[in-house]
């Protein structure tokens, strides 16, 4: 098989009211889907990002990722240790890495992220890169809000963004979560 067409392994993560698809290659997590979206969301993303790749359902291969995401949803995990395989431009990678630096339970604005990557005039491009983040939750784009503190767009939808931010605020105030 060609190296540019990796096999994508996928699973449906179900925890309480949370249901979303996750996918990985042998190198790491590549996709965390939106809350309660059909599998077509994953298939459409895979066709664009990894055209011609084989998609294989494999709960066992996805178990390490599912465990950490579930721990996060339980309020028992602040940081992720599973590998993530980023597939994006250098600019997108810079933005996604900056997102991973936002502390658990805190938020930043799009202009904060633009400043963090030394591109203060690139606020709109930062927004586009955040919108292209394929790995929700583990690359915490839900922690980015408007400069005035308002909730802004999120691939998973406003309800999912609100739930994630509330989860982090609640978990941060209730206990000191181990890393």
Curated annotation (Swiss-Prot):
Among InterPro entries, the record links this protein to: MethylDNA_cys_MeTrfase_AS, MethylDNA_cys_MeTrfase_DNA-bd, MethylDNA_cys_MeTrfase_DNAb, MethylG_MeTrfase_N, MGMT_N_sf, WH-like_DNA-bd_sf
Catalytic activity reads: a 6-O-methyl-2'-deoxyguanosine in DNA + L-cysteinyl-[protein] = S-methyl-L-cysteinyl-[protein] + a 2'-deoxyguanosine in DNA; a 4-O-methyl-thymidine in DNA + L-cysteinyl-[protein] = a thymidine in DNA + S-methyl-L-cysteinyl-[protein]
Query: What's the protein here called?
Result: Methylated-DNA--protein-cysteine methyltransferase, inducible
Where in the sequence is the active site?
141
- Impact noted for substituting residue 167 to P: Loss of activity
Query: Looking at the keywords, is RNA-binding present?
Result: no
Report the source organism. Bacillus subtilis (strain 168)
- Keywords in alphabetical order: DNA damage, DNA repair, Methyltransferase, Transferase
Biological role stated in the UniProt entry: Involved in the cellular defense against the biological effects of O6-methylguanine (O6-MeG) and O4-methylthymine (O4-MeT) in DNA. Repairs the methylated nucleobase in DNA by stoichiometrically transferring the methyl group to a cysteine residue in the enzyme. This is a suicide reaction: the enzyme is irreversibly inactivated.
Gene Ontology BP annotations:
DNA repair; methylation
Q: Which PANTHER family match?
A: METHYLATED-DNA--PROTEIN-CYSTEINE METHYLTRANSFERASE, METHYLATED-DNA--PROTEIN-CYSTEINE METHYLTRANSFERASE, INDUCIBLE
Q: Other comments?
A: This enzyme catalyzes only one turnover and therefore is not strictly catalytic. According to one definition, an enzyme is a biocatalyst that acts repeatedly and over many reaction cycles.
Offer an example of a GO molecular function term for this protein: methylated-DNA-[protein]-cysteine S-methyltransferase activity
- Induction of expression: Up-regulated by methylated AdaA in response to the exposure to alkylating agents such as MNNG.
Documented EC number(s): 2.1.1.63
Record-stated family: Belongs to the MGMT family.
